[in-house]
Design a protein with these regions (language model features):
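Non-catalytic, usually N-terminal nucleic-acid engagement modules in DNA/RNA processing proteins
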Residues: 1-75
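Catalytic cores of enzyme domains
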Residues: 68-254
């Protein structure tokens, strides 16, 4: 059964796939999967190679590569879920690679309903590096994950036991926000302020100032390039301006 599922996934052009039993999925911050999908028993975790776009200093090109993956990933997720439902008469739900996220004062939009990193580790697709990202045995850190949760009972794939991180500290040295200074923790707010400069924080500041400004100043504000960038980032859903921790990691790039 697992081989049939994996053959289907790989036939879509997905780079790798792993399977994890829900009991082996351990995420310290994300909610219990049973609250999302009562009766959930397994996760089918899909892995996608990040394109070389991430190396570009042109952030439009870099982000364009990520958007390409996200579009393909959503389509693949849907097709895998439908395959499971059709072939095995089971229920399946998709877990997106990013947004939508639960927005609350507690999580501040930084905690996913499913931790795809922990799901990937549980599915044998790698282990954590110093940058707190998952390192895949072949693709290194340049990998994006999605998942499909099902009530089909499947055993977990063997874990990746080899330590893949070389502790070179290049990721820490290349983080302009110093979000990785404390080992074992990513300072989400420092990271987001730098990597998403036109995210929700900037939008709040812009619209607060806009509301408090006279009409003539408001006209100037909406004609300013800062507003244009906010508009574009909002239209995309989010827009990264930093891929340093991912692209600087040497593992898998030899």
């Amino acid at each position: 059964m697992k081989d049939k599922i994996k053959d289907f996934v790989l036939g879509l052009g997905v780079d790798n796939v792993g399977i994890a039993a829900v009991k082996d999925y351990k995420s310290p911050r994300s909610p219990d999967l049973q609250g999302i999908f009562p009766g959930a028993k397994s996760l089918v975790v899909l892995a996608y190679q990040e394109l070389s776009n991430c190396e570009s200093e042109n952030m439009q090109i870099a982000m364009g590569g990520r958007l390409d993956i996200l579009e393909f990933a959503r389509s693949s997720n849907y097709r895998v879920a439908r395959f499971l439902e059709r072939e095995f008469k089971t229920k399946a739900i998709t877990v997106p690679p990013s947004y939508p996220l639960h927005m609350s004062y507690e999580t501040r939009g930084t905690v996913g309903d499913v931790s795809l990193r922990h799901a990937a580790v549980a599915a044998g697709l790698g282990n954590f590096g110093r940058h707190n990202l998952v390192i895949h045995p072949k693709m290194g850190t340049r990998v994006v994950f999605t998942a499909v949760i099902t009530n089909l009972e499947l055993p977990s794939d063997p874990p990746t036991t080899e330590k893949l991180c070389t502790d070179c500290n290049i990721c820490v040295e290349n983080c302009p926000a110093h979000a990785l200074d404390e080992e074992g923790k990513t300072d989400d707010m420092k990271c987001l302020k730098n990597s998403q400069p036109y995210g929700i924080g900037s939008a709040i500041r812009f619209w607060t100032k806009f509301a408090e400004s006279p009409t003539e100043e408001q006209k100037k504000m909406v004609k300013d390039v800062n507003f244009w960038r906010l508009y574009q980032a909002g239209s995309i859903g989010f827009q990264y301006f930093c891929f340093n921790c991912m692209k600087s990691c040497p593992v898998g790039q030899e």
